[in-house]
């Protein structure tokens, strides 16, 4: 008698159920996340200076820094905001990219309140002049004068006109050169028009967005300008492209976008 091998009905049901479950898993993965193992925090990693010690304590200190961060050469880390700044003890963290959960001492030097003493100017040593030696004459050096920021009202966007700017940063000024909460002003020279001053944003916001600037850097973007003052006044940037990053700074009504993340402009304090 010929006997035929017949699959057990329970096995066939299990094979069909596993196939359906696998198909549903593929569909759900495609709908909700193309790569469930991807770490989306990599795009939020700020640029770092070469040679800095890794502040991580969760295993990332064993990784190559360039896997997540843009590594800036140490020689190029000059000017305001380069590297890490010393902070006063008790200062709230301005970061919004996850670094606010880290210990401040991992990257910054903590300075105790009232421990910074004012340094007095040392008196120059007397110089003996011999007969016939010409006396030194004072030399006048023309310094770049930063235009004063104009009070911006609710209708400032109606009297100002938008324009595009690009060029090399000649100098950096503003309260942001002394405090992380202050605004950064940059003077741009495009080689054609007279140099112009542009108010970017508070230093902490530029750090968080990855758009730190320094003299000699080429930047471009859009800004608002008072047509009655032309290049003699202070312009207000809507966006800036620096370090390969495009950062939005203000909306169409000249409102700073840092206000949406809880920041306070130093000029408004």
From Swiss-Prot:
Motif MCR (magnetochrome) 1 positions after renumbering to this chain: 48-71
Motif segment (MCR 2): 87-110
Segments passing through the bilayer: 11-31
Lumenal face residues: 32-269
Superkingdom of source: Bacteria
Family membership noted in the UniProt record: Belongs to the magnetosome MamX family.
Cofactor: how and how many bound: Binds 2 heme groups per subunit via the 2 magnetochrome (MCR) motifs.
Protein name: Magnetosome protein MamX
A single GO cellular-component term on record: magnetosome membrane
Entry binding sites for heme 1: 65, 68-69
Topology of this chain in the membrane: Single-pass membrane protein
Key word Iron-sulfur present: no
Keywords per UniProt: Biomineralization, Heme, Iron, Magnetosome, Membrane, Metal-binding, Transmembrane, Transmembrane helix
Subcellular localization: Magnetosome membrane
Note: This bacteria makes up to 60 cubo-octahedral magnetosomes of about 45 nm in diameter which contain membrane-bound crystals of magnetite (Fe(3)O(4)).
GO MF annotations in UniProt: metal ion binding
Cytoplasmic side, ranges: 1-10
Lineage per the UniProt record: Bacteria, Pseudomonadati, Pseudomonadota, Alphaproteobacteria, Rhodospirillales
């Amino acid at each position: 008698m010929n006997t035929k091998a017949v699959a057990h009905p329970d096995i066939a049901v299990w094979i069909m159920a596993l196939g359906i479950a696998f198909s549903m898993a593929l569909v759900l993965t495609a709908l909700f996340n193309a790569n469930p193992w991807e770490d989306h925090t990599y795009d939020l990693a700020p640029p770092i200076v070469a040679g800095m010690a890794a502040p991580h304590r969760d295993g990332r200190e064993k990784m190559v820094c360039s896997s997540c961060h843009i590594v800036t050469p140490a020689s190029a880390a000059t000017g305001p905001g380069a590297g890490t700044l010393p902070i006063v003890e008790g200062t709230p963290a301005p970061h919004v990219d996850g670094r606010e959960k880290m210990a401040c001492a991992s990257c910054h030097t903590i300075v105790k309140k009232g421990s910074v003493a004012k340094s007095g100017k040392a008196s120059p040593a007397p110089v003996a002049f011999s007969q016939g030696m010409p006396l030194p004459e004072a030399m006048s050096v023309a310094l770049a004068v930063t235009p004063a920021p104009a009070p911006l009202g609710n209708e400032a966007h109606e009297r100002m006109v938008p324009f595009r700017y690009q060029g090399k940063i000649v100098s950096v000024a503003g309260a942001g050169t002394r405090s992380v909460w202050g605004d950064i002003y940059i003077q741009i020279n495009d080689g054609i028009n007279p140099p112009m001053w542009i108010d970017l944003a508070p230093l902490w916001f530029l750090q968080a967005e990855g758009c730190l600037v320094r003299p000699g850097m080429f930047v471009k973007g859009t800004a608002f300008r008072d047509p009655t003052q032309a290049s003699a006044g202070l312009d207000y940037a809507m966006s800036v492209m620096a370090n390969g990053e495009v950062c939005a700074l203000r909306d169409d009504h000249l409102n700073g976008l840092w206000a949406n993340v809880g920041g306070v402009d130093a000029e408004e304090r």
